[in-house]
Regions:
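Active-site rim beta-loop-alpha module in soluble metabolic enzymes
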Residues: 152-216
Length: 287
């Protein structure tokens, strides 16, 4: 998966023995910086140290310094952003690391959190909310949600948990990147009843759960179809609240196992149910 990263950079990362991030309260930036380091080639037994780097650390190619140190020097594996001026593009530590690797565009495409948390870390939650066309109060529950807050506190306080979280998140990044490449090859785009449909029936459930949202964002289908992972039929999911589809219109049809009252999900009785007939029934512009 890292074939587009230069051999010199891969060798540099393979030699890293420790990752130094800032002490005190942890943030998404330093946690995901560690995760991305593991995902893109740092050996999994490299220890995470939460402390201020010494001058020798900034020169040591066995030490990857992330989000601390007031230095951006990729050749020495130093990736901090706190010394950058307001006139420079807002880039947190993990974004600077990704730019150096040449995977910044890929990360933006595959992971919605990537750009949002880059903005929150560099601009602040209030300015990010304004950038998104809303208010700080409106996104407060997303920024400070209970799972994230719990992980952040324990990442700061528990070295064993810290390593497990960073390694686990790094593996998730790697799995999603691999799953996306596989899903791209297997997904078919169909024209059914005059609607663009993403057909995921050749894709394993894990690939769909990881990557279907990516496909939807990039290709904007009216709906997706896949095999029901809880039953013996099909699952159809309306995308982007497409006004042309309301699957609740299918309720009571012989093929319908479950039609969500909200109109965005339909589960069918069998895998052989007629997709064209189903979508024709669900069209809101047809009687």
């Amino acid at each position: 998966m890292n074939e587009n990263i230069s051999a010199d950079k891969i060798r540099l990362l393979a030699g890293v023995r420790r990752i130094v991030v800032h002490p005190g309260l942890a943030h998404v930036d330093d946690i995901m910086s560690c995760a991305m380091a593991y995902a893109f080639g740092v050996r999994h037994d490299a220890v995470i140290e939460r402390r201020r780097p010494e001058p020798a650390d900034l020169d040591d190619l066995e030490t990857l310094v992330m989000d601390v140190g007031f230095a951006l020097d990729p050749a020495r594996l130093d990736f901090d952003h706190h010394q950058r001026s307001r006139d420079e593009p807002p880039r947190c530590a993990y974004a600077l690391f990704a730019e150096w690797l040449g995977v910044d565009e890929e990360m933006r495409r595959l992971f919605p959190w990537y750009e949002t948390w880059n903005a929150i870390d560099t601009l602040g939650a209030h300015a990010t909310a304004l950038k998104l066309g809303t208010t700080g109060d409106a996104i407060a529950g997303l920024v400070a949600h209970p799972l994230g807050e719990w992980v952040i506190r324990h990442f700061a306080d528990n070295p064993e948990f810290r390593a497990r979280v960073a390694l686990g998140l790094g593996k998730e990044i790697d799995k999603t990147r691999r799953s996306w490449e596989s899903l791209r090859e297997k997904t078919k785009t169909l024209d059914v009843a005059g609607l663009p449909v993403a057909d995921f029936r050749d894709c394993p459930a894990d690939e769909i759960s990881r990557c279907s949202d990516i496909w939807i964002r990039l290709h904007r289908p009216a709906c997706i179809v896949c095999y029901d992972n809880r039953g013996s039929g099909l699952t159809l999911l309306r995308c982007n609240d497409d006004v042309r589809l309301d699957f609740h219109r299918c309720a009571g049809r012989p093929y319908a196992l479950f039609a969500h009252p909200g109109g965005f999900v339909l589960k069918t009785q069998t895998r052989d149910d007629d997709l064209k007939a189903i979508l024709a029934d669900a069209r809101t512009d047809r009687t």
